[in-house]
Amino acid sequence: MGSCCSCLKDSSDEASVSPIADNEREAVTLLLGYLEDKDQLDFYSGGPLKALTTLVYSDNLNLQRSAALAFAEITEKYVRQVSREVLEPILILLQSQDPQIQVAACAALGNLAVNNENKLLIVEMGGLEPLINQMMGDNVEVQCNAVGCITNLATRDDNKHKIATSGALIPLTKLAKSKHIRVQRNATGALLNMTHSEENRKELVNAGAVPVLVSLLSSTDPDVQYYCTTALSNIAVDEANRKKLAQTEPRLVSKLVSLMDSPSSRVKCQATLALRNLASDTSYQLEIVRAGGLPHLVKLIQSDSIPLVLASVACIRNISIHPLNEGLIVDAGFLKPLVRLLDYKDSEEIQCHAVSTLRNLAASSEKNRKEFFESGAVEKCKELALDSPVSVQSEISACFAILALADVSKLDLLEANILDALIPMTFSQNQEVSGNAAAALANLCSRVNNYTKIIEAWDRPNEGIRGFLIRFLKSDYATFEHIALWTILQLLESHNDKVEDLVKNDDDIINGVRKMADVTFERLQRSGIDVKNPGSNNNPSSNDNNSNNNDTGSEHQPVEDASLELYNITQQILQFLH
């Protein structure tokens, strides 16, 4: 630290040799003494701060330089919350035209900006404007320290929008193209910190940062690559930005696909996450596959790194939404690795994305359906169905519901004893889980060539199909009531005597249907609907001469439509009993 004051003797410029006032000479003497015992003193208050402040306000350039260097060294070692009295002299130094002072003052402010409270106070005291001015200068060290300080300030949420609207983004974008790697790192890091809110991302895009970030994906520096891939990943969260990227950045996808093979694990992960966000749009779902993304993704979902597995399975999940990609994904060898991901019981997200992808692939071509069953996906999903978080159960039940829609899959599902999972799932308190399970169960009761498994599951497990029908008839939830009635009708239309007898001879089921018929009939009567002539409606609210009541009529229309549909199904069922 003694070197901070040694410049008093050597400089020859006029400001350096300005006469030193007595109070300044005293401050120098005191400061040298304080520095000898610096580990025992607080330089942010009392005598040490007063001595430093005296030097800051001196007309002698050497004294200002000494103060700046002292502040830089002290703040590097001792970082804590400070007062306005500490920041004010540093901000004064920041406005100096002397490069040495600028470098040291920016460094000191950047050091203090590590503290969360200081970040807010620096911006409140007008620190952004002089920092922006320093960024726009020619001195590389000054640029580097000024950008580093803004990077630190931008980690505080309260500051982000102020920085975004301060005029800092354009010089930051310019400095991101600097030939000096330290400046480039700090600038891209600062831009990344500005991508955590939609409003700030919009400012960033408007400042022209996107083409720079995309071009820097080719950087040989892993830090710059990481900052740029992460920033672009965040920018791609917004639909408007994805559309703009699609129009203006034709090489973005191919660059990100290449980075999935980066030696840096975090770059690889962020590139994959960026592709995941882009794949929210249909056009990108196709483009990622065309750019050769599948071989990288199938390798990454088998990685030992959980963040990489999560990023890659989330990406393939989005890509699998597009029907044209389904066969290509299956051919690329994803099915068995996806099934293995269902064993990640410590990661609910990985399980959810894996099941969701399997669901998207399940009901495509006959070839894919066959490979799906051969992969062990049904058995693994059945195994997890009753022993996994609700979010995973929801995805599994949706997968079963999709599979059960295809007539060619029904017997395979029944032979896999899927009813052992579906029936208990109908008890779930989560309506999505119970509804999907019930829909799958209903479809499996419709148009199958062999009803042996249906008959075996009539009253077991958990009261069996019979119990499910009775519970859903009593649910007071129109969707569930509809599923129960439709299932009963399918069983009665099965042309299987044993199945028909099970339904017809069950008083609880038949009484439930009759009660539903009575309730829906009364509901429709109260609404003025003649169930014997549905086209006739006595409700005055629908009368052309009473147009002011149209809103009232439209409010009740969905309920009336649901009641009419339920009533009609009950009548079809009851005809089988005559």
From Swiss-Prot:
A Pfam family of the record is Arm
Q: Where is this cross-link: Glycyl lysine isopeptide (Lys-Gly) (interchain with G-Cter in ubiquitin)?
A: K77, K515
Region (Disordered) residue ranges read 527-557
Q: Which residues carry this modification: Phosphoserine?
A: S11, S16
- Please list the residue ranges that the record marks as compositionally biased, kind Low complexity: 533-552
Which chain positions have S-palmitoyl cysteine-type lipid attachment? C4, C5, C7
Q: Keywords on this record?
A: Isopeptide bond, Lipoprotein, Membrane, Myristate, Palmitate, Phosphoprotein, Repeat, Ubl conjugation, Vacuole
* Topology of this chain in the membrane: Lipid-anchor
Positions with an attached lipid (N-myristoyl glycine) read G2
SMART domains named among the record's database cross-references: ARM
Molecular functions per Gene Ontology: identical protein binding; protein-membrane adaptor activity
Q: What is known of its domains?
A: Comprises a flexibly connected N-terminal H1 helix followed by armadillo repeats (ARMs) that form a right-handed superhelical structure.
Purpose of the protein: Functions in both vacuole inheritance and protein targeting from the cytoplasm to vacuole (cvt). Involved in the formation of nucleus-vacuole junctions (NVJs) during piecemeal microautophagy of the nucleus (PMN). NVJs are interorganelle interfaces mediated by NVJ1 in the nuclear envelope and VAC8 on the vacuole membrane. Together, NVJ1 and VAC8 form Velcro-like patches through which teardrop-like portions of the nucleus are pinched off into the vacuolar lumen and degraded by the PMN process.
Protein name as catalogued: Vacuolar protein 8
